[in-house]
Structures are given as C-alpha cells and as structure tokens.
Amino acid sequence: MYHGALAQHLDIAQLVWYAQWLVIWTVVLLYLRREDRREGYPLVEPLGLVKLAPEDGQVYELPYPKTFVLPHGGTVTVPRRRPETRELKLAQTDGFEGAPLQPTGNPLVDAVGPASYAERAEVVDATVDGKAKIVPLRVATDFSIAEGDVDPRGLPVVAADGVEAGTVTDLWVDRSEHYFRYLELSVAGSARTALIPLGFCDVKKDKIVVTSILSEQFANVPRLQSRDQITLREEDKVSAYYAGGLLYATPERAESLL
C-alpha cells in the first residue's frame, strides 16, 4: 500500500471527500427541513396543544421568524407566533389524542376537513404590472374564448343530484397564465352569483356538469367582496367548498366503500 492509504482501495483523501459531502448535504437538509416549517406551523393538536419557539431562543423544529417584503407592498413575517383563532367545529370520536375528528355541523359551511382553507391575505392577487390577476371576461375585454372551443355562457349547470343549479353568465380568466380559472354562475331561484373552479367542471356542448356538490348547496358557495375581483383567501375558500363536497355533499360519500 502507498503512503496515506488505509486499505488497498481506500485512503484518507477519499474519506475526507466523502465526509465533506456528508456534512454539506446534512446541513442543507436540516436547513431546508426547518425553513419549510414557515407555513403550516406551529402545529396545533386537536386538544389545543401549540408548539411555539421560545422568545429568547430556538427549538430545532421551528426557524426564527423571518420578514419577507412583498412585491406590491407590505411585509409578512413567518412563522407567526399567534395561534389559530378560528373555532374548529370538530369533535374527536374518542377520548385519546390522535382520535379521528368528526364534523359537528355543516362541514362545507364550517370549512373543516377537505373543505378547510388557509387564512391567506384578503388582498387581490396581482400581475407583474399591478393589475388584478383573476377577473371576469367583462373586465378583461382583451381576452376571448379560443375559436372552436365551447362557449359555456348561457349553458345550464347540472349538479350531482341531476338538478339544474343555474346558468353560466361569465368566465374568469387568469391574466398572467392566460387560463380560465372559474365559471360564474347565476344561482337558480336566487339573485346571487357563485364561482365554480374550472377543475370541478365537466364542460359539455349543451351543459356543465358539476358532481362535487348538490344543486341546493350552490346557495352556500362563499361570496366575494367584489363583483369583479377575488382575493387570495376567497380563492382558497371557493375551491375548498367544492373540494369538501367530494366527501361531504352527501352522507354516503363520507362512508367507507366496503
């Protein structure tokens, strides 16, 4: 063996090389795992236990608070030290920590389970030039439906129970992505309108089929503060309502398949 070798095919330089990469990737992994806890943390357990970093120090699980400057003004600091203030209308099915949670009211309206949403800012998402990002076609007049595609305006919306829930009156377009995000619905038997995320729509030539919720549940779709704009939180609330319907629209959906 030559000088510095520990074995026939292993020497100190090779060990140092391996150790160097082990240290580098360990540090990177620990840093990334701590940084990804800036959203969704601190954890709140069903019985109300909250894990917060100490004021004068730091625990391994949570990073120090960091302030980010937003592109269109304002700042946000995460992780935030204030606990969740919303009342969760859920009850444990048993008396031990970790037992399943069951809705105690209307889970779609109460925003629990798959119908839950993050409390994002009540501000309108903006394009790079500061315009409202998601708006109806009546506002974004420079956008149109591609030639040959179905124009859903005027088509009926049929819900999961086979009942007509209303009529499509407009489409909402993402100005940045050049993609339609929502259909605007005039709810049957009501003076109000509601948005439907396009991902929950089966667009046919003569109708729009929405299987996630029942016709009567369109009346409780979260309302918007503005007729022509939607905030970040409202985006989540609307999508969460339809997502929750996949499990909670009927009692049978929440039961097991077997």
Curated annotation (Swiss-Prot):
UniProt modified residues of type N-formylmethionine: M1
Intervals, Cytoplasmic compartment: 31-258
> Which ranges of the sequence are coiled-coil?
none
The segments annotated as topological domain Periplasmic are 1-11
Q: Its principal location?
A: membrane
- Topology of this chain in the membrane: Single-pass membrane protein
- SUPFAM superfamilies, sorted: Photosystem II reaction centre subunit H, transmembrane region, PRC-barrel domain
- Give the location in the cell: Cellular chromatophore membrane
Q: Which GO terms describe its biological process?
A: photosynthesis, light reaction
Q: Which UniProt keywords apply?
A: Bacteriochlorophyll, Chlorophyll, Chromophore, Electron transport, Formylation, Membrane, Photosynthesis, Reaction center, Transmembrane, Transmembrane helix, Transport
Q: Does the keyword Iron-sulfur apply?
A: no
Q: What GO molecular function terms would the record report?
A: bacteriochlorophyll binding; electron transporter, transferring electrons within the cyclic electron transport pathway of photosynthesis activity
CC annotations in GO: plasma membrane light-harvesting complex; plasma membrane-derived chromatophore membrane
Cofactor section? a bacteriochlorophyll; a bacteriopheophytin; Fe cation; Mg(2+)
Q: How is the cofactor bound?
A: Binds 4 bacteriochlorophylls per trimer.
Transmembrane segments annotated in the record for this chain: 12-30
What biological function has been recorded for the protein in this entry? The reaction center is a membrane-bound complex that mediates the initial photochemical event in the electron transfer process of photosynthesis.
Protein family membership: Belongs to the reaction center PuhA family.
Quaternary context: Heterotrimer composed of subunits L, M, and H.
Protein known as: Reaction center protein H chain
Q: Which species expresses this protein natively?
A: Blastochloris viridis (Rhodopseudomonas viridis)
